[in-house]
From Swiss-Prot:
Protein name: Large ribosomal subunit protein uL2c
UniProt subcellular location: Plastid, Chloroplast
Gene behind the chain: rpl2
GO CC, any one term: chloroplast
Native source organism of the sequence: Physcomitrium patens (Spreading-leaved earth moss)
UniProt xrefs under PANTHER family: LARGE RIBOSOMAL SUBUNIT PROTEIN UL2M (PTHR13691:SF5), RIBOSOMAL PROTEIN L2 (PTHR13691)
Subunit structure: Part of the 50S ribosomal subunit.
Annotated InterPro entries: NA-bd_OB-fold, Rib_uL2_dom2, Ribosomal_uL2, Ribosomal_uL2_bac/org-type, Ribosomal_uL2_C, Ribosomal_uL2_CS, Ribosomal_uL2_dom3, Ribosomal_uL2_RNA-bd_dom
Broad class of the protein's primary localization: plastid
Cross-referenced SUPFAM superfamilies: Nucleic acid-binding proteins (SSF50249), Translation proteins SH3-like domain (SSF50104)
Length: 277
């Protein structure tokens, strides 16, 4: 996908760039596959902020995506490639031979008119879904299940791709985009290819208002707050944090403190941790 640059008519458009939509099909989303989702604004059921700096943003209709790919042995045809405001990746509409329609994540290189299938014996072609046990080593994959039958949970953002590097016993070894190397059941389903919209991270927001359109509010530094609001707050003028090391707003160690649970069930399955920073 191309990147469209703005001319510097205003300070907001100077250096601003957005993604082009040439490969997308101009169409309305399928009504049966969309529904209204209430915007929580970062609050829980009691109205307490649980995720800071969220709120506002443009209204969105949620598109129901088929992450399970459980439509077995029935081929489908790609009819549209559409924009999805709820994720960085684009989506495509699949018309199956039995008349059903579903949205899936758009793999890079898949075009309107192409045919895909989900099957245990599916050919190794872009967009096809099959278990890891039937894939050759070195295959590029995305939308990978952690628990077989639960639906894809790994590698689902724009431009993401994982690699199948080994198979032994009941487990397959994957190299994830983060650099993490982990084990997954060979019965887990995955989709062939890399997710499209690879230039999603290369665009420049350009102005604060564009962040507000996305529902993201200003991220305030703790050092400019009052002492009641943050451990770093207070002091006269530009004061240091006054602590031995940085802390979170709730007084816990920040910046470098590992937050992963020591007894998490998947620890034995991770052979190499992801890169930090």
């Amino acid at each position: 996908m191309t990147i469209r640059l703005y001319k510097a008519y205003t300070p907001g458009t100077r250096n601003r760039s957005v993604l082009g939509f040439k490969e997308l099909v101009k169409t309305n989303p399928q009504k049966k596959l969309t529904f209204w989702q209430h915007n929580k604004q970062g609050r829980n059921n009691r109205g307490v902020i649980t995720s800071r700096f969220r709120g506002g943003g443009h209204k969105r209709l949620y598109r129901q995506i088929d992450f399970r790919r459980n439509k077995k042995n029935i081929s489908g045809k790609i009819t549209t490639i559409e924009y999805d405001p709820n994720r960085t990746a684009n989506i495509c509409l699949v018309h199956y031979e039995d008349g059903e329609k579903r949205y899936i994540l758009h793999p890079r290189g898949l075009k309107v008119g192409d045919t895909i299938i989900s099957s245990n014996e599916a050919p190794i072609l872009i967009g096809n879904a099959l278990p890891l046990t039937n894939m050759p080593l070195g295959t590029a994959i995305h939308n990978i299940e952690i628990t077989p039958g639960k639906g894809g949970q790994l590698v689902k953002s724009a431009g993401a791709v994982a690699k199948l590097i080994a198979k032994e016993g009941q487990l397959a070894t994957l190299r994830l985009p983060s650099g993490e190397v982990r084990l997954v059941s060979q019965n887990s389903l995955a989709t062939i290819g890399q997710i499209g919209n690879v230039d999603a991270n290369n665009k420049t927001i350009g102005k604060a208002g564009a962040k507000r359109w996305l529902g993201k509010r200003p991220r305030v530094r703790g050092v400019v707050m009052n002492p009641i609001d943050h451990p770093h707050g207070g002091g006269e003028g530009r004061a240091p944090i006054g602590r031995e090391k940085p802390l979170t707003p709730w007084g816990r160690t920040a910046l470098g403190k590992r937050t992963r649970k020591i007894k998490k069930y998947s620890n034995p399955l991770i052979l190499r941790r992801r890169k930090n920073g």
